[in-house]
Amino acid sequence: MIGVIFGVIVPYIAVAIFVIGVIYRIVNWANSAVPLKIPTTGGQQKSFPFIKRTIYDRFDSPYTWWETAGRMLLEIFFFRSLLKNTRYYLDRVSQKDARWLWLFGILFHYSLLLVLIRHSRFFLDPVPSFVETLSEIEAFKGVFIPSVYMSGLAIVAALFLLWLRRIFLSRERTLSLPSDHFALILLLAITISGNVMRYFVKADLFAVKELLMSLMTFNIGHAVEVANTIEPIFYVHFALASFLLAYFPFSKLMHAGGVFFSPTRNMPNDNRARRHVNPWDPADVPLLAKGITVAGRVYKSKKLDWDTYYSMYTDQLQEIEEADYKIVPEEL
């Protein structure tokens, strides 16, 4: 009965919650307005022709969509922002290199990628050759029995380091929420139980693959039959993974999809060349004036009726009038 609950029912519920939750979050992000152009950058923005920009500036402060795409690729695959991580101390007027966080992040994410690729053998038949090759490369074949996979140990080490950072560093400890600790503990529990099943308490992997293939093909009857033959250690690992899958769309782990919708990352820094229209601006504002003329010079603004414009900038306009300048509405 436990095998049926945690091997058949719980996984289907978890996948359904995961799919619905991810779609909901993505649709919600896609429909969210971006009132301001706020790409975070430390590079030189494209300006006058005589101001030269380096390759670094092109990707850190992108002007075209191709440069923005390059920036996004660097962000997704190499964590560009974390690589520039520097901690500043205002009270001591000093700074400290904190790129160890980038190292921990790279170690965790790429170890997770390798682990997921290796786990794909349980869902595919036949197993692709590149999965077999990758497993051969990262395993210490002939040194240990059974073979030791580097990614399986590296992901546990990376998660411990990321969790210790939130525990022992005062600033991170103050900013950390219970959900931050919970996500790391859940990931640690999954990876540790997987390593225990790999090296200490064995499970019948042929039966595991048969169960997962039955779930993939919706062969419920066969899945129920196989589920009752698998050792309990597998269901500890599988239940934790199912819970993570259901929890994923409603946690900070959803940054895996949210990074594609982040305006600080996916917008070109072209404020000087293109005007960003705020989608929240009301569409029914009377379009009667587009600015003012002072001493023969036109100062453009939003296209408003003169009374509205004057009420918005009363103090500034009165100062200009007191300086004996004549103000003329710039008519359309």
Curated annotation (Swiss-Prot):
Membrane topology term: Multi-pass membrane protein
Keyword vocabulary terms for this entry: Cell membrane, Electron transport, Membrane, Oxidoreductase, Transmembrane, Transmembrane helix, Transport
Signal peptide: none
InterPro entries reported in the protein's UniProt record: DsrM (IPR047660), Heme-iron_electron_transfer (IPR051936), NarG-like_domain (IPR023234), NarG-like_sf (IPR036197)
Record flagged with keyword Transport: yes
Pfam families noted in UniProt: Nitrate_red_gam (PF02665)
Cellular component terms (Gene Ontology): plasma membrane
An example Gene Ontology molecular-function term: heme binding
Localization of this protein: Cell membrane
Transmembrane parts of this sequence: 3-23, 97-117, 143-163, 177-197, 230-250
GO biological process, one term: anaerobic electron transport chain
Role according to the record: Has menaquinol-oxidizing activity. HmeC and HmeD subunits may together mediate electron transfer from menaquinol to an unidentified electron acceptor on the cytoplasmic side of the membrane.
Subunit structure as annotated in this protein's UniProt entry: Consists of five subunits: an integral membrane subunit, a cytochrome b-like subunit, a cytochrome c subunit and two iron-sulfur subunits.
Full protein name: Hdr-like menaquinol oxidoreductase cytochrome b-like subunit
Species of the source: Archaeoglobus fulgidus (strain ATCC 49558 / DSM 4304 / JCM 9628 / NBRC 100126 / VC-16)
